[in-house]
Amino acid sequence: KGDMKILAQMLKNVEAKQGKVEFKSPLVVAPPTYNIVDELKQEGDWDVLVKYSGFEFDDTDPKGLARTKYENMLYLERPGCNLCMGNQEKAAPGDTVMATSTRLFQGRVVKDSTEKKGESLLSSTPVVVLSTILGRTPTMKEYEAAVDGILLTKFKPSQKQLVR
């Protein structure tokens, strides 16, 4: 749920800075569970995501076939494991996929094409989101502006001396 909230706030930050959000690469988002979607709806974040999406899953009208081609937009997929697990939906052969999933084994999410090796890159949620908007990896200045006001982690290293 935290990553979905980060995404919603980043979209608001980018719009505030640039006036609009335009994707230069596809961003495929699959919420972990329906319960999380319900919570995001109650908290107002789902409306933010829908505002910027070009596709929102609809259980009353499920898509018939797995998607094999993607446009440069935000896809709000059915909760669960879609592209993240390399199930039926995969990127086109030879594409470069940047994802937050650790299950990026060679050929699982993207296969090689005759012209180019398919690449799977592991990254953080903010870097993935901003990269799809920019069409490239962000500079540090762009990253800092996009995550302004977002608590990315509550982790804090121990201040105790661990080794004497």
Model-derived regions: residue spans:
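Fe-S-dependent hydro-lyases/dehydratases of central metabolism
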Residues: 1-164
